[in-house]
């Protein structure tokens, strides 16, 4: 074998010739090699070994020198090339050839090319350059506008190489802008990427924690904070403030002044870092000592769902900063009312609403059109901190928008009496005209009632408030003017309008559908609606059709929607440009919901269940159609499909969905959204919604109910049914209820209401994990300010009683022994004591925990129990109960016969 190999390698140029192999044939052959060295030995005998001849060429250094000297090759320094491309990109980011920008760029170029500049100096120079360019970029955008800046940029590309590079950069930039949906603030976007990189490096994500001051100074970071506050795009501004704030506070050496710190706190709230936000507020509360700072704290507690802390801080604020009108910022009022209504605490919501009404009666409101005229066009500048504090402490007058939002909250949470009172009081506000009343009706969608009598009926529901006749008269005139404007007297609308307010507020989707239908369809503006709005209209149409029993017509509509999806995939130009919108998971969810309701109706009426198989087959067919249409299930669809399987006691299908869903949630925990470099907003962090979590807990509760060991003596019929269901269960939950609770309450950022909390407690009781319930109750009351009322307390005590009886039944030989054991247990005055009505929260919690501890001790048949599993549950949830040790000691003193 002969090997011929010649290669040339250098730092800038690599050239490698082909390797050619020559094998001498062993058979006799009249052949002469073209290689001089083997002319005299062309044939190798059979017994002779192969020989390898390596041909020597010029060295790599000789060839490299020859190419550089004679062939006009040029040696390239890779670092210089990267630096040159970087300068070209910065020039592209300048957008236009402004003299000041060019001057800044030339200064930076000199610094980067200087041999005396090390990496730190270069990074420092780049950061300074970007800060100045961002400031200029924002000012240009505010003065010249986006289109003019772009046109000037295109007109100034004289240099061919720069023009080509700009096309490359612009192509990448356009893809980024399409994804982000931002105005092209190129230097600003680049600065945010650098800030993101700094966060990754200096906040312990990539490397161990270091100091940011190794790269940039505090002065530069302070300047960066001022620059990002001016960004006109809200999302970019919030992210910029978040990133710079993390770097400043990450050093542990500096703290912003209260006003600037409030900007950083707001960004922490936006990106879900509630603990850090509250910590900054509470550590500066006494030092700042201003009402506006307390209002900021109130917003933090509300947005982080710490309603108990909200109540405490509100009481403190009222006592410390009392005003003539019991003033509370409209922003705080709106959010607090919405939060309390969402957990079903109507009493607290009504108290806050009454407070809002009194404020409006004293100071009036700002009309929407007037408010728009007075909105500031830019950032407000102050002469000093004193003027800024005075501005922040000014009483904010509520607007029409604030008032109508609160009416909406009460309407759609079915607190009709308070909503009616608000509507009536609105008519009494000085300066209210018929046009203003009509505006309220349209915004609350009350104009979609069939006639005014349906609206008049809501005023009769509030017996504590008598509506003046003048208010009703003005409202009626406004109602009639709206009907005339939208022509809803037409027969086509008559069958579609709502019979009463309850029907109006029952389905927001349906209400939105009718609103869009009335305002757009009649004017011929259907195709001007965006794809989401049209999709919602069809969703509402499906809802109406299925609700009225028109199943076949609903399937015809679904078929059209599926056809629209197929057409848009074949021809992308048709996407969102067809009369029928593309099918999505919401459309399929309506059908599944319809079949679930059918099964529930069959159970309620005790009708034969032979149609269950038919419904299950239809749902299976829907899933197949979804797969064929490549529609990805969303949280709404998953909730409905789980509801359907749950109503069928089909736990196999239920946990086929739940198990992988919870596993993916654990992998993409919302704690990762607290990343300092790439933060996520609320709705992006929460991949499982509150209704879906509620349904998952419902399935768990029913599952453990079926798995409970029923008494051999009691509930024989129930035991037979459970055994039949139990035999069919092949797939079981992989996520423990304790883990599910942590995912729901902590990582899921869910605020459970009373019904949800009762479901959680019920699940733990049915699963037999009574050791966790003391920690669960403590967590719910401490974080979510849940009111453990008399009904919930009795529910827990009755559940404990059932546990006692079930265990007694299982250890009894016959019914006679069971009765004796039951009588002995029930006569024991130490257990299952009722809680007197009116007992305060602390005593109620203590009583319930004590009863649970007694049951655990009774079940363990121990004279002195350590209750380690109870304490472990408290540690798992990161909460504590100060009286736990005292209760344990008290319970261990009791003598309870097992």
Curated annotation (Swiss-Prot):
Species name for this entry? Saccharomyces cerevisiae (strain ATCC 204508 / S288c) (Baker's yeast)
Q: Where is the transit peptide?
A: 1-31
- UniProt subcellular location: Mitochondrion
**Principal subcellular localisation of the protein:** mitochondrion
Q: Which GO terms describe its cellular component?
A: mitochondrion
Mind listing the UniProt keywords for this protein, alphabetically? Mitochondrion, Transit peptide
A Gene Ontology biological process noted in the UniProt record is: mitochondrial ribosome assembly
Q: Cite a single GO MF annotation.
A: translation activator activity
Indicate yes or no for the key word Mitochondrion: yes
Protein name in the entry: Protein SOV1, mitochondrial
Q: Which domain of life is it from?
A: Eukaryota
Extract the coiled-coil ranges from the record: none
Q: Kindly give any further remark recorded in the entry.
A: Present with 396 molecules/cell in log phase SD medium.
Q: Which gene encodes it?
A: SOV1
């Amino acid at each position: 074998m002969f090997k011929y190999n010649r290669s040339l390698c250098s730092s800038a140029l690599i050239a490698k010739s082909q390797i050619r192999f020559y094998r001498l044939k062993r058979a006799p052959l009249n052949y002469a090699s073209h290689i001089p060295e083997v002319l005299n030995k062309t044939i190798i005998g059979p017994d002779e070994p192969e020989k390898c001849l390596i041909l020597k060429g010029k060295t790599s250094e000789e060839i490299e020198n020859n190419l550089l000297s004679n062939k006009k090759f040029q040696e390239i320094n890779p670092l210089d090339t990267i630096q040159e491309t970087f300068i070209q990109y910065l020039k592209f980011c300048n957008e236009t050839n402004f003299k000041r920008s060019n001057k800044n760029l030339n200064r930076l170029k000199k610094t980067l090319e200087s041999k005396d500049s090390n990496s730190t100096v270069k990074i420092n120079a780049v950061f300074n350059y970007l800060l100045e360019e961002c400031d200029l970029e924002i000012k240009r955008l505010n003065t010249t506008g986006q289109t003019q800046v772009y046109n000037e940029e295109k007109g100034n590309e004289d240099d061919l190489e720069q023009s080509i590079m700009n096309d490359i950069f612009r192509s990448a930039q356009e893809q980024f802008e399409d994804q982000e949906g931002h105005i092209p603030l190129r230097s600003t976007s680049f600065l945010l990427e650098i800030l993101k990189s700094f966060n990754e490096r200096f906040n312990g994500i990539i490397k161990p924690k270091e100091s940011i001051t190794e790269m940039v100074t505090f002065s530069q970071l302070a300047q960066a904070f001022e620059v990002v506050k001016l960004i006109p795009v809200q999302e970019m501004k919030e992210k910029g403030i978040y990133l710079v704030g993390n770097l400043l506070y990450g050093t542990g050496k500096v703290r912003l002044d209260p006003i600037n710190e409030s900007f950083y706190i707001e960004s922490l709230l936006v990106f879900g870092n509630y603990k850090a936000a509250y910590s900054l507020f509470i550590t500066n509360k006494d030092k700042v000592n201003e009402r506006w700072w307390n209002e900021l704290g109130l917003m933090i507690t509300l947005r982080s769902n710490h309603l108990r802390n909200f109540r405490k801080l509100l009481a403190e604020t009222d006592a410390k900063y009392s005003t003539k009108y019991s003033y509370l910022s409209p922003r705080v009022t709106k959010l607090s009312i919405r939060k309390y209504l969402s957990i079903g605490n109507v009493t607290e919501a009504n108290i806050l609403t009454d407070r809002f009404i009194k404020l409006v009666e004293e100071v009036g409101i700002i009309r929407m059109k007037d408010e728009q005229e007075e909105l500031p066009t830019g950032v407000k500048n102050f002469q000093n901190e004193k003027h800024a504090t005075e501005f922040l402490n000014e009483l904010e007058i509520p607007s029409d928008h604030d008032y109508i939002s609160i009416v909406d909250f009460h309407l759609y949470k079915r607190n009709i009496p308070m909503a009616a009172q608000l509507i009536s009081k609105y008519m009494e506000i000085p300066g209210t005209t018929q046009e203003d009343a009509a505006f309220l009706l349209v915004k609350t969608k009350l104009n979609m009632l069939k006639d005014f009598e349906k609206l008049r009926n809501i005023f009769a529901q509030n017996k504590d408030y008598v509506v003046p006749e003048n208010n009703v008269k003005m409202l009626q005139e406004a109602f009639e003017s709206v009907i005339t404007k939208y022509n809803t007297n037409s027969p086509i609308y008559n069958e579609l309008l709502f019979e009463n307010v309850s029907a109006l507020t029952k389905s927001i989707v349906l209400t939105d559908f009718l609103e869009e239908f009335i305002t757009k369809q009649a004017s011929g503006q259907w195709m001007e609606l965006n794809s989401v709005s049209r999709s919602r209209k069809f969703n509402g149409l499906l809802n109406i059709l299925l609700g009225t029993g028109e199943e076949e017509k609903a399937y015809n509509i679904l078929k059209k929607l599926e056809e629209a999806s197929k057409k848009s995939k074949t021809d992308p130009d048709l996407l969102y440009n067809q009369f029928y919108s593309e099918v999505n998971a919401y459309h399929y969810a309506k059908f599944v919901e319809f079949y679930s309701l059918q099964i529930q109706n069959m159970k309620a009426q005790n009708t034969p269940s032979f149609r269950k198989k038919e419904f299950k087959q239809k749902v299976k067919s829907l899933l197949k159609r979804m797969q064929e249409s490549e529609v990805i299930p969303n949280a709404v669809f998953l909730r409905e499909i789980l509801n359907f399987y749950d109503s069928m006691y089909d736990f196999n299908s239920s946990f086929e969905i739940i198990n992988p869903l919870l596993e993916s949630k654990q992998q993409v925990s919302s704690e990762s959204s607290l990343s300092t470099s790439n933060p996520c907003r609320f709705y992006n962090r929460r991949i499982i919604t509150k209704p879906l979590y509620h349904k998952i807990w419902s399935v768990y509760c029913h599952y453990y109910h079926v798995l409970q060991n029923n008494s051999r003596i009691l509930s024989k019929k129930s035991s037979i049914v459970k055994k039949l269901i139990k035999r069919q269960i092949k797939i079981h939950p992989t996520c423990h209820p304790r883990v599910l609770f942590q995912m729901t309450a902590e990582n899921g950022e869910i605020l459970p209401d009373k019904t949800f909390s009762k479901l959680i407690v019920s699940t733990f009781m049915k699963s037999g994990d009574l050791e966790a319930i003391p920690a669960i109750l403590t967590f719910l009351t401490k974080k979510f300010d849940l009111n453990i009322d008399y009904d919930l307390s009795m529910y827990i005590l009755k559940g404990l009683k059932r546990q006692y009886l079930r265990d007694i039944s299982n250890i009894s030989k016959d019914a006679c022994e069971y009765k004796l054991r039951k009588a002995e247990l029930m006569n024991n005055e130490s257990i299952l004591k009722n809680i007197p009505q009116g007992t305060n929260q602390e005593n109620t919690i203590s009583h319930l925990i004590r009863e649970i501890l007694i049951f655990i001790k009774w079940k363990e048949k121990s004279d002195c129990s350590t209750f380690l599993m109870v304490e472990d549950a408290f540690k798992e949830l990161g909460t504590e109960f100060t009286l736990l040790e005292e209760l344990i000691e008290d319970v261990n003193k009791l003598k309870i016969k097992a």
